[in-house]
Amino acid sequence: MSRFSSALQLTDLDDFITPSQECIKPVKIETSKSKTGAKITIQEDGSYVQESSSGIQKLEKVEITLADCLACSGCITSAEGVLISQQSQEELLRVMNANNLAKLNNQRDEIKFVVFTVSQQPILSLARKYNLTPEDTFEHIAGYFKKLGADMVVDTKIADDLALIECRNEFIERYNTNRKLLPMLASSCPGWVCYAEKTHGNFILPYIATTRSPQQIMGVLVKQYLAKQLQTTGDRIYHVTVMPCYDKKLEASREDFFSEVENSRDVDCVITSIEIEQMLNSLDLPSLQLVERCAIDWPWPTVRPSAFVWGHESSGSGGYAEYIFKYAARKLFNVQLDTVAFKPLRNNDMREAVLEQNGQVLMRFAIANGFRNIQNMVQKLKRGKSTYDYVEIMACPSGCLNGGAQIRPEEGRAARELTAELECMYRSLPQSTPENDCVQTMYATFFDSEGDLNKRQSLLHTSYHQIEKINSALNIKW
């Protein structure tokens, strides 16, 4: 079963096959010229051997990186084994063990400051698995990471709030100055973004919001803001995020999120809910409660909050649609809304909300989850029949709470039942208010400081790139 979202799996209908069958990345093999030719044979262990007049030579194994796959118009899931190996629990444990050894031997030049950022959805997935409250779960997970050698464990709320504020501002700007680029499409789901770049290219990309996802905003905060507070540099920090889907591994590997100045990626490693479960299982722990809890770190310039697991309005995928809808209603039409009702259309994964005044439709927003609804939305946009001003798009059915790397339901239980439980847990969380002292202080002291008018744009926004289709004989299906 594939680990990536359906938006990536279904780029081509026959995509779920092994790398040796399908990967079309051109590879240069250094061989000596031979007038007599050479024969390549496959050995029993799967290795390749070249036989020529000069002798027998074992060919080197092709190495394909995440960056290669993001720049390729071919498959995604066919190279899945290669991708996961570079963003995996094994790689994380290798780095942590090496760092702990460097600390033990006082090898200061080799020691890195390790930061774990944990998003809400994995916390809820683990809380449900181990029958704990979300706050207790987070503290036990923090204790586990500290035991591995983490120096700091933080939540994502500040990045979630920054993403919401930047998205709302971007929407207002578009609505007032460039309505041709409406509907504005959400940008926080990497599965959707990757699919858009590879399949619809320059037609769809201008509609996608440029605001970075919370994961990548956290990357900026950790590698730049936190590095400055610690009086170090970004390449001296190893940043790990815990996310609900495998597509976040692809997002962290985008070249857009590599800093030439810091010589490091904003996020070095992404692990998922399932991988955390596997790591805990490897310790033969019957319950997460057996792990000593640890307080969550708070490195931001305001008073420490009373809670660290927060929810957002309307959806478990960040609450973009409802937050922007309410803000735009107030800002554009002077309409104050306490709640927004998103009504299901053909299915629960396609919902819409409409702002009306005197029988006239002022705004129309939608939430589109899952590949089927994404396809329908894009086709309507291409035919010029889209009536929406904003669409919150997530590749996974039911959104991020049902991310592809969330812990699976027990045997005999439907995934839909588990998702409903997680949604209930999410709605019980304290509601985040993006306009808070912490966010305002970060804007004043970091993003808008020093008179640099481009700093906020460069650190909180990104760009997208059409992936050209490769016309190669290797693409031909027989």
From Swiss-Prot:
For this entry, list what GO says about its biological process: iron-sulfur cluster assembly
Annotated GO molecular function terms are:
4 iron, 4 sulfur cluster binding; metal ion binding
Which PANTHER family does this UniProt record tie to the protein? NITRATE, FORMATE, IRON DEHYDROGENASE
Q: Where [4Fe-4S] cluster 2 is bound, by residue?
A: C189, C245, C396, C400
Keywords (alphabetical) are: 4Fe-4S, Iron, Iron-sulfur, Metal-binding
Q: Which organism is it from?
A: Anopheles gambiae (African malaria mosquito)
Q: Mind telling me what this protein is named?
A: Probable cytosolic Fe-S cluster assembly factor AGAP009023
Q: Which residues does the annotation say bind [4Fe-4S] cluster 1?
A: C23, C69, C72, C75
